[in-house]
């Protein structure tokens, strides 16, 4: 048997049909350099029942240490409230193939545009996804002589791709540790207000986190 740890990347079939796989290929290459095996699965949608069931079956066979999800929005079923990505109980990282160009991202004070924030950050967080970060931006190619228009494809950002690999590796190391070896920090917000209201609404939140004797 192959003793190498395995990660699974899930992405849209449309990327394959459009030969727009540069960010996926880059992740494969980066994982290989870290001696991590990589398997990819392409889908039309994670919400199709037959697809979701097949995904669960495949993930059980693959037994990945982590899943990288490049599909957008929520993957939870309306009927069950469950996502096929949660079937094997490993961290699921939401990776972002941005719909905007790098220049737009740099100029935007909040980085991603509103569509990307909704599709790849806010809604996936409701599913319990871990934000993996951006792996690529849209980039127009030269005008295709046959089609007579510039084809827009995803251009990988290698520095950001490596950050995703680092994050996956660190989560794997963390999961391998015993609970008593872990140190957890809980960061609570304290919105502006009067001094006597400082942290008032959070006063009981810390109680359940205290160790029991």
Each PLM stretch: what is its role?
Residues 1-6, 84-86, 92-94, 99-185, ...:
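Flexible inter-domain linker/hinge segments
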Residues 63-67:
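Proline-aspartate-enriched helix->loop->beta-strand connector
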Residues 203-213:
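Single conserved hydrophobic/aromatic residue that forms the stacking wall/gate
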Residues 39-42, 47, 55-62, 76-96:
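Internal alpha/beta domain cores that form substrate/cofactor-binding pockets in large enzymes
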Residues 17, 33, 37-59, 177-185:
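Metallocofactor- and cofactor-centric catalytic cores in central/energy metabolism, strongly enriched
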Residues 15-18, 46-49, 74-77, 100-104, ...:
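Flexible loop/turn segments at secondary-structure boundaries
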Residues 25-39, 206:
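Short helix-loop-beta junction
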Residues 1-25, 32-33, 192-194:
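A short, flexible N-terminal coil/short beta segment enriched in small residues
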């Amino acid at each position: 048997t192959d003793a190498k740890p395995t990660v699974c990347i899930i992405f849209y079939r449309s990327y394959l049909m459009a030969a727009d796989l540069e960010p996926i290929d880059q992740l494969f290459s980066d994982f290989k350099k870290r001696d991590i095996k990589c398997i990819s699965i392409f889908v039309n949608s994670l919400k199709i029942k037959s697809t979701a069931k097949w995904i669960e079956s495949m993930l059980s066979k693959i037994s990945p240490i982590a899943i990288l999800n490049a599909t957008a929005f929520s993957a939870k079923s309306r009927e069950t409230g469950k996502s096929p990505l949660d079937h094997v109980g490993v961290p699921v990282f939401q990776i972002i193939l941005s719909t905007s160009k790098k220049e737009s991202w740099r100029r935007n004070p909040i980085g991603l545009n509103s569509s990307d924030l909704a599709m790849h950050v806010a809604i996936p967080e409701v599913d319990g996804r871990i934000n993996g970060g951006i792996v690529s931006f849209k980039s127009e190619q030269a005008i295709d002589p046959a089609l007579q228009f510039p084809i827009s494809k995803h251009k990988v950002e290698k520095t950001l791709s490596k950050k995703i690999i680092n994050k996956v590796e660190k989560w794997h190391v963390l999961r391998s540790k015993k609970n008593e070896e872990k140190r957890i920090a809980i960061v609570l917000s304290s919105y502006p207000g009067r001094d006597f209201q400082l942290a008032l609404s959070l006063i009981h939140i810390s109680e359940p986190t205290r160790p029991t004797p």
